[in-house]
Amino acid sequence: MEKDKLQMIADHYGIKKQLRQLAEECSELAVEASHSARKGLTIGIIEEIADVEIMIEQVKYLGRISEDDIQEVKEAKMERQLERMKEENNG
């Protein structure tokens, strides 16, 4: 059901509009993250994360980006970060 709603919205607006909206939502999340770092977590961070996740799902759908593609990149990035941390601890 949720997937159908996301796809209907994504199809209505199209990739260019949804990429712009994703950028806007990410900006709002960044502002809220900065605020939360100073004042502590609030409901605002949850709302902004939800907005970004909704937009990411739409962009993945419109761009035909698979979970496997994303997972592969995430794994490589996490491995690279773990290596950096290891170097920090040894340096």
Where are these regions (language model features)?
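Flexible "arm" and connector segments at domain edges
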Residues: 1-91
